[in-house]
A protein has these predicted regions:
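Structural signal for interior beta-strand "rungs" in well-ordered beta-sheet cores
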Residues: 4-111
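C-terminal segments of enzyme domains that contribute to small-molecule binding surfaces
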Residues: 58-75, 106-152
């Protein structure tokens, strides 16, 4: 449509849109045919509320009231994003999200629910394996063994 060409926002005419939808920096926003968007939802640039191509009938997400979807996030399939939730920028959400949750990552994971952080080993990023340091440590160990062997 002409509006989509001017704004970069594509909303299928079959989508159901609630009151107070706010699309900030809307270029690249896509809302699919069977999507349902609740009241007071905020979408940032590059958001896709799309299908996975595997379903018939209802194949796009339902976004409940007061949800914020960060830039570049993809919410795909016949899933529900619960009220008062936040989807982090760049996330790919393929499963239902409970109300009052924060989701980040690829695939999207709930990291906060009802304002309480969810502990997860997957979320600790300060103890990630470093293959280069592992190789250096192996070399150091080998050198130490060789030096000890030569001293004997």
């Amino acid at each position: 449509t002409r509006a989509a060409r001017k704004t970069g926002i594509e909303i299928h005419p079959g989508a159901t849109i609630g009151h107070g939808l706010f699309i900030d920096h809307g270029h690249g926003v896509v809302i699919g045919e069977t999507a349902i968007v609740g009241n007071n939802v905020t979408l940032y640039q590059g958001v896709t509320l799309g299908g996975t191509g595997k379903q018939k009938g209802k194949r796009h997400p339902t976004i409940e009231d007061n949800v914020m979807v960060g830039c570049g996030a993809k919410v795909l399939g016949d899933i529900t994003i619960g009220a008062n939730s936040m989807i982090g920028a760049g996330s790919v959400v393929l499963n239902d999200v409970p109300p009052n949750s924060t989701v980040v990552g690829v695939p999207g994971r709930v990291v906060k629910r009802d304002n309480v952080r969810i502990p997860s080993a997957d979320l600790v990023q300060v103890h990630l394996p470093d293959p280069v340091m592992n190789d250096i440590q192996q070399l150091k160990d080998t050198v130490a063994r060789l030096v000890k062997h030569m001293e004997e």
